[in-house]
A protein has these predicted regions:
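An amphipathic, basic-hydrophobic alpha-helix
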Residues: 69-101, 140
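Short glycine-/acidic-enriched loop or helix-start segments at secondary-structure transitions
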Residues: 17-18, 47, 112-115, 136-137
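N-terminal strand-loop element at the rim of the active site
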Residues: 7-14, 27, 31-79
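An aromatic- and histidine-rich active-site surface loop
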Residues: 86-88, 94, 101-121, 133-135
Length: 143
């Protein structure tokens, strides 16, 4: 039986963590793993590559593709609301499946979201891609 794996990352922009995630998704054994990537925003240079290789769930659509001014305003409100809302509520709203492994692929919000998972049986991993001593902004996410 395949292991169900969830990766959580804020976007698929052109950073190093996004490239590493894309490489993992492209090369992981699909006979052993069923991969889902959850992003806050559906944006970045790796979106198409990820969509070809696994399930991609995005909390918000691609802002660039919104043409209606009201939709753009709603997007901005929803974006701010996601970061202010209780992570357990956000998790419950967007993560509908049960996963064997849940991986926060960057520090910060993704880590808080995975830590808020209601699934007690999943293995949870926080994959940190920065030097936390030099990145003081990350302090608020850790004890």
């Amino acid at each position: 039986m395949k292991k169900k794996v969830l990766f959580v990352i804020e976007s698929l922009s052109g950073g190093g963590a996004e490239k590493v995630l894309t490489t993992i998704v492209k090369n992981i054994d699909k006979t052993k793993f069923d991969i889902t990537v959850l992003t806050i925003v559906k944006t970045g240079i790796y979106v198409e590559e990820i969509e070809k290789k696994c399930t991609l769930i995005s909390m918000l659509p691609e802002y660039e593709k919104l043409t209606n001014p009201i939709a753009k305003m709603k997007y901005k409100v929803d974006y701010k609301k996601i970061y202010k809302e209780d992570c357990a509520k956000i998790y419950k709203k967007y993560v509908k499946n049960v996963y064997d492994v849940e991986i926060a692929f960057v520090e910060g919000f993704a880590t808080k979201l995975v830590a808020s998972s209601w699934n007690r049986n999943s293995k949870k991993i926080a994959w940190v891609h920065v030097d936390l001593i030099r990145r003081a902004y990350a302090d608020e996410y850790f004890l």
